[in-house]
From Swiss-Prot:
GO terms for molecular function: proton-transporting ATP synthase activity, rotational mechanism. Belongs to the ATPase delta chain family. It is a peripheral membrane protein. It comes from the Bacteria. One of its GO terms (cellular component) is plasma membrane. Keywords: ATP synthesis, Cell membrane, CF(1), Hydrogen ion transport, Ion transport, Membrane, Transport. F-type ATPases have 2 components, F(1) - the catalytic core - and F(0) - the membrane proton channel. F(1) has five subunits: alpha(3), beta(3), gamma(1), delta(1), epsilon(1). F(0) has three main subunits: a(1), b(2) and c(10-14). The alpha and beta chains form an alternating ring which encloses part of the gamma chain. F(1) is attached to F(0) by a central stalk formed by the gamma and epsilon chains, while a peripheral stalk is formed by the delta and b chains. Its main location: membrane. Gene3D superfamilies: N-terminal domain of the delta subunit of the F1F0-ATP synthase. F(1)F(0) ATP synthase produces ATP from ADP in the presence of a proton or sodium gradient. F-type ATPases consist of two structural domains, F(1) containing the extramembraneous catalytic core and F(0) containing the membrane proton channel, linked together by a central stalk and a peripheral stalk. During catalysis, ATP synthesis in the catalytic domain of F(1) is coupled via a rotary mechanism of the central stalk subunits to proton translocation. This is ATP synthase subunit delta. The keyword Membrane applies.
Amino acid sequence: MLPAKRYAEGLLKLAQEEGKLEKFYEDLFKIYDLFKTNKQFVDVLFDLEMKVSNKKEKIKQFLDESIDRYIVNLICLLIDKRRETLLPYIPFYYKEMYDKIIGNVEVEVIVSEEVDEGVLRKISNWLLKRYDVKNPRFKVKVDRSIIGGIKLLFNNIEVDATIKGALDSIKKELIQNAI
């Protein structure tokens, strides 16, 4: 198991005990945003010559007052153990486990033309009944090549109810039977 994943698991267990699943999620991604937007934060975090105590104090100055103390403690622990490089990966491992706990599932919806909220609600209800997907997050893509129908991709599952998919299936069957 990857070290970043172990830290994320420990943090998730703590979040569950403290009733702060969503708060930790938000805070971890606030810190991740610092990586993307604040070069000084990254420079301080990865400065190998700076004393650990100085580094922790400087890093705390970058953090918003709203960041939970447990998240701040995690960052300090990573600095103490010289594992700062794990910090950008922890939010994504946490998100993966968080999504499983609360039932979030990324669902790619491929259609031949735009769909409205009513269609997405029907898909959501079907996913709940058929696959126990409680909180689908839809990412709709329009692909005119499917001709009509719908294709869903989620959790390594593909549900193909497109005209193109049906035609491809018939074509494959005809080729197999012709041999």
